[in-house]
Amino acid sequence: MSEYITLSLDEVCALSYQVLTRHGLSDAHARAIAEVITQGQRDECHSHGVYRLLGCVRSVREGRIDPRAEPSLRHVSPGVLEVDAHYGYSLLGFHTGLPILAEKARSQGIAAMVIKRCFHFSALWPEVEAIADYGLVGMAMNPSHSWVAPAGGRQPVFGTNPLAFAWPRPGGQPFVFDFATSAIARGDIELHARQGKPIPEHWAIDADGQPTTDAKAALQGAMQTFGGHKGSALAAMIELLAGALIGDLTSAESMAFDGGVGATPCHGELVLAFDPRVFLGEGYEQGLERAEGLFAAIARQGARLPSQRRFAARARSLEHGVQIPRGLLEDIRGLL
């Protein structure tokens, strides 16, 4: 018997939607979450694919999340939009505010969308790719729970604090990156623990502050930042921009708000959009050519552009479907 089961992308999306609605999420929330989970599985980002359904359901069961919350919008200024998720999942808030964010960026050249009081678990690249689909440059960032120790420290202060960026490219996939400022995403350590696999020593320290290859010990200790003090500084910046600046929780406050329940982190998110046409005016085409020259200079050395591996996985999945570990799929189907 194979350890993996192949599903089509339509089957992944339908299963995700069924699980989510079975546990009380509204149609709008379930569709938004099922879409991004399918995108994660499609692009072989396994820590943000169907595995996340387990956490979604657990968080709803704990009663922290309003599964039927409807986002509300407030125009703070011509260039700033606030989306109040009312303690629902963030994705519906993002999709609700995205068209208005794009309008503001086209009017002002640069615009910000602040999503507040939201529960967030998903990758950010689907969001910045959606901004790039408008022909805009996108950035997104958010804190999480305080799982990550600062460089030189032993106690968790930061979240995994991802940062994502997308640059639209005419006639091709956008230039996209999305990475945690921790050495690895939290979900990757969770998957290693689930599968009984060791982790690289630089990912985390145990509860005694010692480097560890034991994924379960890492989950009880603290994760490390990537790049030492540089990753630590970026993590602090995201705490400030997507926490203090927007009037929402830092990662430490999100952890305190959770109260030991272990639900999806609750915090805010900062999303930025830039319109190249406003910035460049008559030099728009020349600006895009400069960007393409940069990408060509990278690629002709044999270096890989960010997300190329993910785009290749996307093409495979669209043709052949995706493989899901049998045990994980059984756990998910057990939620129905």
Curated annotation (Swiss-Prot):
The active site is at S47 (charge relay system), H48 (proton donor), D188 (charge relay system). The keyword NADP applies. It catalyses: L-proline + NAD(+) = 1-pyrroline-2-carboxylate + NADH + H(+); L-proline + NADP(+) = 1-pyrroline-2-carboxylate + NADPH + H(+). NADP(+) binds at residues 120-124, 178-180, 229-230, 304-310. It is an enzyme of class 1 (oxidoreductase). It comes from the Bacteria. One of its GO terms (molecular function) is oxidoreductase activity. Keywords: NADP, Oxidoreductase. Substrate binds at R52, T160, R186, G187. Its EC number is 1.5.1.49. The keyword Thylakoid does not apply. Belongs to the LDH2/MDH2 oxidoreductase family. Homodimer. Catalyzes the reduction of Delta(1)-pyrroline-2-carboxylate (Pyr2C) to L-proline, using NADPH as the electron donor. May be involved in a degradation pathway that converts trans-3-hydroxy-L-proline (t3LHyp) to L-proline. This is Delta(1)-pyrroline-2-carboxylate reductase.
